[in-house]
Amino acid sequence: MNKFITFEGIDACGKTTQIELLSKYLDSIKEENIIVREPGGTDISEQIRKILLDKNNNINSYTETLLFLSSRSQLINEVIKKSIEKDEFILCDRFTDSTLAYQGYGRGLNIGLLNSLNDFFYFQMNNYR
């Protein structure tokens, strides 16, 4: 069974605080866990994060979405899959729901397409080949 928990919400609503509290609790009951964030969590994903968060960049909505998805793919393949295989809890600061909220509803991209792309990532997480 995957132990993958995502925390979603607007900026500064307490996601990081709740993740840290849950991680400390899991540590106290001897449950292995890791904390990851989107975008980020790997060297490549952190570089993508810098591009996305740079206010000087005027990124169109499609490029922005593809960068977020690229960061997610890297995180899944470098970190999340390995943690699933080790039966660790994965505590993730944002994931696919943020894509729907920000790129779908916020930027007006096609929700059906975003849902299909998000499904691909859940498949990727559970496919160990």
Region locations from a protein language model:
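Walker A (P-loop) phosphate-binding loop of P-loop NTPases
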Residues: 12
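ATP-dependent small-molecule kinase phosphotransfer cores
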Residues: 31-122
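Hydrophobic anchor at the beta1->P-loop junction of P-loop NTPases
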Residues: 4-7
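Hydrophobic positions on the alpha1 helix immediately C-terminal to the Walker A/P-loop
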Residues: 18, 22
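Conserved lysine of the Walker
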Residues: 15
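Rossmann-fold NAD(P)-dependent oxidoreductase module
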Residues: 25
